[in-house]
Amino acid sequence: MSRKTPIERYRNIGICAHVDAGKTTTTERILFYTGLSHKIGEVHDGAATMDWMEQEQERGITITSAATTTFWRGMEAQFPEHRINIIDTPGHVDFTIEVERSLRVLDGAVVVFCGSSGVEPQSETVWRQADKYEVPRMVFVNKMDRVGADFLRVVDQIKTRLGANPVPIQLNIGAEEEFKGVIDLIKMKAINWSSEDQGMTFTYEDVPADMQDLAEEWRMNLVESAAEANDELMEKYLEEGELSEEEIKAGLRQRTLNNEIVLATCGSAFKNQGVQAVLDAVIDFLPSPTEVKAITGEDELGNAIERHSDDDEPFSALAFKIATDPFVGTLTFMRVYSGVVKSGDTVYNSVKEKRERLGRIVQMHANKREEVKEVRSGDIAAAIGLKSVTTGDTLCDLNNKIILERMEFPVPVIQIAVEPRSQADQDKMGIALGKLAAEDPSFRVETDNESGQTLISGMGELHLDIIVDRMKREFSVDCNVGNPQVAYRETIRGTTKSEGKFIRQSGGRGQFGHVWLKIEPSEPDEGFVFVNEIVGGSVPKEFIGAVAKGVEEQMNSGVLAGFPVLDVKATLFDGSYHDVDSSEIAFQIAGSMAFRDGALNANPVILEPMMKVEVTTPEDWMGDVVGDLNRRRGMIEGMDDGPANLKILRAQVPLSEMFGYATDLRSATQGRASYSMEFSEYAEVPKNVANRIIAERT
């Protein structure tokens, strides 16, 4: 079966932004104009098509990335039919992981900003993630009908706060209540969308006389940006002082794909103005799968290999999301990078080293499914019923194995204890937590060794609220929830050598394991590093792995207060063994003993998660807010001017001091200040706090 749409006409894009920038509303309008939904769903009515979980519709935020396939031929039907695969991503900071795994598989992104709030903290996080994966992007400044909306101010913030190079290809006509439409700077025409048919039709008009000078100034900026794409365009521009519409588009496209510029558009999705032009810009300026860098991976021997977006290359795909569907079970969302795969084919999961049979393959429209017989390079689809696939796994051809680069997931910073209310809930809770953990790599489940409690950890209070809520709704599990606890960690600051000797000899076969370890800090964020420097066989090869396992087990149990130990390098340099009595378990225990004794003598410290906090407050309350953050052991890092006489405070504050902050901030500022926070890093706890934590744990 051949392709319906040539791959050059594919666009795999993400729509991402800060909470409340109007991202889901923008996606709803895209679905409406591309003919996929006949009635527009509003977020504030709880009817948005892309927000299909009950919690999303209740809270009016997007939690999971819904994937949708649509088709577009242009506002004037000026293009052949293009296939647009859209991923709508959450904007709340607790769900940053969803954004990360979406950007990993996209070719381009539309970043939505609010016309009045401009660049907000989560926008910076999303922008950094897009930089990391080198995703070409464009900007849609939404909510131009809101009080305080200012397109060019937001463009300036994108330049100063994000370090990007924005090039407006439109200007707004009027703002706030007076917002009427946009000027297309490439055509130098005003676009007026009809309010009678929800913006399905439009007319081109002359640029308003009072905006002619401003439009010409920004058009010159646009043409110069296009001319810088290559020498040919620059020569023509210098000779003639102008470029044709096609040349402008070609130059802007080339520079966007090279991540040199970011094109900026504006509008109001809610008022049905501007989204239509965004769709045209997606086709004109964002890349097809063949225009982005080939994906790199490793073969079985660890050699680097590439896969291109080509149906003739061997099949390779990345599983970027696992979702539990109430009717069909597990859905594995995958991005196909190369080759073709049909339903019924057997593929290889190269990370887990297992074969998987692809039963049914479906293309998603939010939470509606359409079954397809095959998927090809460039496609985003979901497979039903895969057994052992988790997020970040590679699926590939049985005879051409490849591991695409793994995604890195953040360490959870907050945990709560959950207890089932009845014995019946006990069994269901285990199943529910297992499924939810498979869906979300930033959510972990563990059992406390001392109390036997089940602990769940995640990226924030909202994250864990939603997990508990989903257990109740989707799996009918009732549970009691404890107070949030901070996920402390331990590490060492010094270097030491230590001996671990485990001997049990009481008639018959005994146990004997003896090791010497050098214990020192590893590089920050390097995790656990184990080095084997045994020469001459003082510890036989078959026991080396057991020593490493013993060290790792002790690291998980901690040495000071029972918290997992981070960033340690352990070097096994000597030891001895017994021909008969030595065993793996003996060396495992010896490794564990050596690590515990050594770590206690290597200046162990407790680490706590530090949060990057941004508080937006009216100037009158500034002193109160700063004083309160100082009381919470916060370090003020800087201050910026926000919109409408607001100040934006940036600070680093320990997570343990931030519980209940929302309520305190509201009462201190009469509800006029707001804040956001995200994990920054683990930092050493002051001595007095460390002593208190150790006392509470022992």
Swiss-Prot record:
<dbReference type="InterPro" id="IPR035649">
    <property type="entry name" value="EFG_V"/>
</dbReference>
<dbReference type="Pfam" id="PF03764">
    <property type="entry name" value="EFG_IV"/>
</dbReference>
<dbReference type="InterPro" id="IPR005517">
    <property type="entry name" value="Transl_elong_EFG/EF2_IV"/>
</dbReference>
<dbReference type="InterPro" id="IPR047872">
    <property type="entry name" value="EFG_IV"/>
</dbReference>
<dbReference type="InterPro" id="IPR035647">
    <property type="entry name" value="EFG_III/V"/>
</dbReference>
<keyword id="KW-0251">Elongation factor</keyword>
<keyword id="KW-0963">Cytoplasm</keyword>
<dbReference type="GO" id="GO:0032790">
    <property type="term" value="P:ribosome disassembly"/>
</dbReference>
<keyword id="KW-0547">Nucleotide-binding</keyword>
<dbReference type="Pfam" id="PF03144">
    <property type="entry name" value="GTP_EFTU_D2"/>
</dbReference>
<dbReference type="InterPro" id="IPR005225">
    <property type="entry name" value="Small_GTP-bd"/>
</dbReference>
<dbReference type="GO" id="GO:0005525">
    <property type="term" value="F:GTP binding"/>
</dbReference>
<feature type="domain" description="tr-type G">
    <location>
        <begin position="8"/>
        <end position="290"/>
    </location>
</feature>
<feature type="binding site">
    <location>
        <begin position="17"/>
        <end position="24"/>
    </location>
    <ligand>
        <name>GTP</name>
    </ligand>
</feature>
<dbReference type="InterPro" id="IPR004161">
    <property type="entry name" value="EFTu-like_2"/>
</dbReference>
<dbReference type="InterPro" id="IPR014721">
    <property type="entry name" value="Ribsml_uS5_D2-typ_fold_subgr"/>
</dbReference>
<dbReference type="InterPro" id="IPR004540">
    <property type="entry name" value="Transl_elong_EFG/EF2"/>
</dbReference>
<dbReference type="InterPro" id="IPR031157">
    <property type="entry name" value="G_TR_CS"/>
</dbReference>
<dbReference type="InterPro" id="IPR041095">
    <property type="entry name" value="EFG_II"/>
</dbReference>
<comment type="function">
    <text>Catalyzes the GTP-dependent ribosomal translocation step during translation elongation. During this step, the ribosome changes from the pre-translocational (PRE) to the post-translocational (POST) state as the newly formed A-site-bound peptidyl-tRNA and P-site-bound deacylated tRNA move to the P and E sites, respectively. Catalyzes the coordinated movement of the two tRNA molecules, the mRNA and conformational changes in the ribosome.</text>
</comment>
<protein>
    <recommendedName>
        <fullName>Elongation factor G 1</fullName>
    </recommendedName>
</protein>
<dbReference type="GO" id="GO:0003746">
    <property type="term" value="F:translation elongation factor activity"/>
</dbReference>
<comment type="similarity">
    <text>Belongs to the TRAFAC class translation factor GTPase superfamily. Classic translation factor GTPase family. EF-G/EF-2 subfamily.</text>
</comment>
<dbReference type="InterPro" id="IPR009022">
    <property type="entry name" value="EFG_III"/>
</dbReference>
<dbReference type="InterPro" id="IPR009000">
    <property type="entry name" value="Transl_B-barrel_sf"/>
</dbReference>
<dbReference type="GO" id="GO:0097216">
    <property type="term" value="F:guanosine tetraphosphate binding"/>
</dbReference>
<feature type="binding site">
    <location>
        <begin position="142"/>
        <end position="145"/>
    </location>
    <ligand>
        <name>GTP</name>
    </ligand>
</feature>
<dbReference type="GO" id="GO:0003924">
    <property type="term" value="F:GTPase activity"/>
</dbReference>
<dbReference type="InterPro" id="IPR000795">
    <property type="entry name" value="T_Tr_GTP-bd_dom"/>
</dbReference>
<dbReference type="GO" id="GO:0005737">
    <property type="term" value="C:cytoplasm"/>
</dbReference>
<dbReference type="InterPro" id="IPR020568">
    <property type="entry name" value="Ribosomal_Su5_D2-typ_SF"/>
</dbReference>
<dbReference type="Pfam" id="PF14492">
    <property type="entry name" value="EFG_III"/>
</dbReference>
<keyword id="KW-0342">GTP-binding</keyword>
<dbReference type="Pfam" id="PF00009">
    <property type="entry name" value="GTP_EFTU"/>
</dbReference>
<dbReference type="InterPro" id="IPR000640">
    <property type="entry name" value="EFG_V-like"/>
</dbReference>
<dbReference type="InterPro" id="IPR027417">
    <property type="entry name" value="P-loop_NTPase"/>
</dbReference>
<feature type="binding site">
    <location>
        <begin position="88"/>
        <end position="92"/>
    </location>
    <ligand>
        <name>GTP</name>
    </ligand>
</feature>
<dbReference type="Pfam" id="PF00679">
    <property type="entry name" value="EFG_C"/>
</dbReference>
<keyword id="KW-0648">Protein biosynthesis</keyword>
